UniProtKB/Swiss-Prot annotation:
Disulfide bonds join 48-62, 55-66, 61-73. Pfam families: Conotoxin (PF02950). Residues 23-45 form a propeptide. It is found in: Secreted. Expressed by the venom duct. Keywords: Cleavage on pair of basic residues, Disulfide bond, Knottin, Neurotoxin, Secreted, Signal, Toxin. This is Conotoxin MiEr93. GO terms for cellular component: extracellular region. Residues 1-22 form the signal peptide.
Length: 74
């Protein structure tokens, strides 16, 4: 009988703890937030310019070659 009471109290305590933790996460108190859809989109965007695209002092050409005289990716 005592064991049953202890188990019931333990389950109630753990349930209350989970609900309290879930409430704090819902309010934005978590340490590591999941990426927003906009952040995921930024990671998936292309980071280089196609042939004919502009390039400058820091060339980011997909082909790897930048004509710095005219500022165009080759």
């Amino acid at each position: 009988m005592k064991l049953t009471c202890v188990l019931i109290i333990a389950v109630l305590f753990l349930t209350a703890y989970q609900l309290a933790t879930a409430a704090s996460y819902a309010k934005g108190k978590q340490k590591h937030r999941a990426l927003r859809p906009a952040d995921k989109h930024l990671r998936l965007t292309k980071r280089c310019n196609d042939r004919g695209g502009g390039c400058s002092q820091h060339p980011h050409c997909c082909g790897g070659t930048c004509n710095k005289l005219i500022g165009v990716c080759l």
